[in-house]
Amino acid sequence: MSNNSSTSFKNQKPVEPIGIIPRSIIRTFNRFIIQLFPNSNALVIQEFRISRYQVFVSIQCLLSLIFIPLIITFLSKTFVFLPLTEYVWNTQTDDIFLNSYLEKEALSELQDFEEQLYFDYFVSPNTYETPNWASYQISTDSSSQLESSFNNFPEILKSEIQKKTLELATHYNQKSIESLTNLFSDFVSFGTFALLVIILKPQIIILKSFLIESIYSLSDTIKSFLLILGTDLLVGFHSPRGWELFLEFVLNRFGFPHDENFIFLFVATLPVLLDTVFKYWIFRYLNKISPSTVATYHAMLE
């Protein structure tokens, strides 16, 4: 008896096909029919076990897809890529900057520091020896001006500039190493995620079914609210600034140059493409699956 029950449980599919009619309605109707039969208690228990198994597998799959790539990325970055990159970068190359953008950024920061020293030097004459006011020119955009003004500095200010230069060199050398390390570790993270998608394909099908069923169980108002919230965050009026910050974060993470033309082009085109995809999805699929949600969505927009 128990063997037949376990065999029947294993043969039962935890994923139901998706049709035009929401599965919540079909499931409610099936439960009503099942309760009309004498052995309805056993079937209800079996259905409960299937639902519990579906929830357990979905949570396990979701946590695996999130935390396994993060853990592997952290371990590979800390114990493999970072020491290896530091060794190769500091011993096999003479470069400090990964690209010219980081070099210009360091030079600009050094010039700002020099101008701050000029300001402090002029407003606090008692702190340093009396300056020769006619010999000072604030450097703005030239390394030669920086060098000539450096020669006019007192020794204490020269030491401050030298100290700041060493700090910037160390900082940007480490930043170049971290940029390369982030590139390698993120590539490993992406590969790990793709491998998990292939290995956990049955569990992902169950997870997808669980998420769709959970969304279907929501009311039309809540579904419309979530739809408006998602579209406004991605393609709304204030979304370009968010996309700009996201792109700057990606460029800083990998040490890529900040090309303003590329950033403006990205911000101007991607929200438009996403808005077109959302509208097509609402018209093509959501209008067939849940017309009431589409009606509520348009009513809330108006």
Swiss-Prot record:
It comes from Tupiella akineta. Pfam families: CemA. GO terms for molecular function: antiporter activity; proton transmembrane transporter activity. It is found in: Plastid, Chloroplast inner membrane. GO terms for biological process: potassium ion transport. One of its GO terms (cellular component) is chloroplast inner membrane. Contributes to K(+)/H(+) antiport activity by supporting proton efflux to control proton extrusion and homeostasis in chloroplasts in a light-dependent manner to modulate photosynthesis. Prevents excessive induction of non-photochemical quenching (NPQ) under continuous-light conditions. Indirectly promotes efficient inorganic carbon uptake into chloroplasts. It is a multi-pass membrane protein. This is Potassium/proton antiporter CemA. Belongs to the CemA family. It catalyses: K(+)(in) + H(+)(out) = K(+)(out) + H(+)(in). The chain crosses the membrane at residues 55-75, 187-207, 225-247, 262-282. HAMAP family: CemA_PxcA. InterPro entries: CemA. Keywords: Antiport, Chloroplast, Hydrogen ion transport, Ion transport, Membrane, Plastid, Plastid inner membrane, Potassium, Potassium transport, Transmembrane, Transmembrane helix, Transport.
